[in-house]
Design a protein with these regions (language model features):
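Arg/Lys-rich, positively charged N-terminal/basic patches that mediate binding to nucleic acids
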Residues: 1-21
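Residues that recognize and position ribonucleotide moieties
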Residues: 3, 47, 87
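N-terminal targeting/export leaders
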Residues: 7, 23-29, 37-40
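Membrane-topology and secretion signals of cell-surface/extracellular proteins
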Residues: 11, 20, 43-46, 92-95, ...
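Basic/aromatic recognition patch in beta-strand/loop cores that engages polyanionic ligands
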Residues: 37-79
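Enriched for short, Lys/Arg-rich terminal
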Residues: 68-104
């Protein structure tokens, strides 16, 4: 398994969308299978995966945006948002987030 690193923006968003139990399930899912999400084209390697909230199914779930740095064993959780309330995040914004991570 890999280490999950929550970015400050992700932390601000996740508590409003997922219970602590759901957050644990999500982190386990991603750390056990870091390639589960689709790579967002032109994003610098950012991945996007759907996660179903309890009682909501995938259509009532969230999208989770994350970035793998598997060579050092880390997966960075970047964003999480309700599918019903937010459209796709533009690739150039995701690419900028990756650039920011590379300064960490």
């Amino acid at each position: 398994m890999f280490t999950i690193v929550e970015t400050p923006l992700y932390i601000k968003m996740v508590d409003n969308l997922l219970t602590k139990e759901e957050q644990g399930e999500l982190h386990t899912m991603v750390s056990q299978n870091p390639d589960i999400g689709d790579v967002v084209p032109k994003s610098g390697g950012v991945r996007k995966v759907r996660f179903a909230r309890q009682g909501g199914g995938k259509s009532g779930g969230v999208r989770v945006i994350y970035y793998n740095r598997l060579e050092n064993g880390k997966i960075f959780m970047l964003l999480v948002y309700a599918k019903a309330k937010t459209e796709n995040i533009p690739a150039h914004i995701l690419k900028d987030l990756v650039k920011e991570l590379n300064t960490w």
